[in-house]
Amino acid sequence: MERTFVMIKPDGVQRGLVGEILSRFENKGFKIVAGKFGVLAESIVDKHYEEHLAKPFYPGMKAYITSGPVFRFVLEGDNVVATVRKMNGATNPTEANPGTIRGDYALSIGKNVIHAADSPESAAREIGIHFTPAELVSYTKIDESELYE
């Protein structure tokens, strides 16, 4: 079973979209196996976005991502990395299809509601930055045998 890292950004939290977004993923059949709510420490942001540290847009992005609380969580399911990326929609909301999270809710490319890992390798890296192994919970959903067998 594959896992991915997802983060609802400050604009998504402040607009009251956490429940709606979580419902979309759960309704798709994915399982939430970890979650944290709060304002990110700058050291976590620097680790998470280390590939962007030297880029000119990084200070503004860092200021935004630490401007309010985020909800970070780990989803588990078959092909979860690629499916979550499709459900999120294009990074630029003007290019995101209606019905996707960004197509329905994002207001700008800078404030686009949600982040998700772009590959299984990135997911493992990001999960390791935000969660300890002990924080990842294994359990069986009542309907899981019907979804994955």
From Swiss-Prot:
| Keyword vocabulary terms for this entry | ATP-binding, Cytoplasm, Kinase, Magnesium, Metal-binding, Nucleotide metabolism, Nucleotide-binding, Phosphoprotein, Transferase
Substrates-to-products reaction catalysed:
a 2'-deoxyribonucleoside 5'-diphosphate + ATP = a 2'-deoxyribonucleoside 5'-triphosphate + ADP; a ribonucleoside 5'-diphosphate + ATP = a ribonucleoside 5'-triphosphate + ADP
Where ATP binds, per the record, is at 9, 57, 85, 91, 102, 112
- GO BP term, example: UTP biosynthetic process
Listed cofactors: Mg(2+)
Give an example GO cellular component term for this record.
cytoplasm
Active site at 115
Q: What class of enzyme is it?
A: transferase
Q: Cite the PROSITE patterns for this sequence.
A: NDPK_LIKE
Q: EC annotation? A: 2.7.4.6
One MF term in the entry's GO annotations: ATP binding
Protein location:
Cytoplasm
Q: What does this protein do?
A: Major role in the synthesis of nucleoside triphosphates other than ATP. The ATP gamma phosphate is transferred to the NDP beta phosphate via a ping-pong mechanism, using a phosphorylated active-site intermediate.
* Annotated family: Belongs to the NDK family.
Tell me the protein's name. Nucleoside diphosphate kinase
Q: Which organism is it from?
A: Methanocorpusculum labreanum (strain ATCC 43576 / DSM 4855 / Z)
> What lineage, starting at the top, does this entry show?
Archaea, Methanobacteriati, Methanobacteriota, Stenosarchaea group, Methanomicrobia
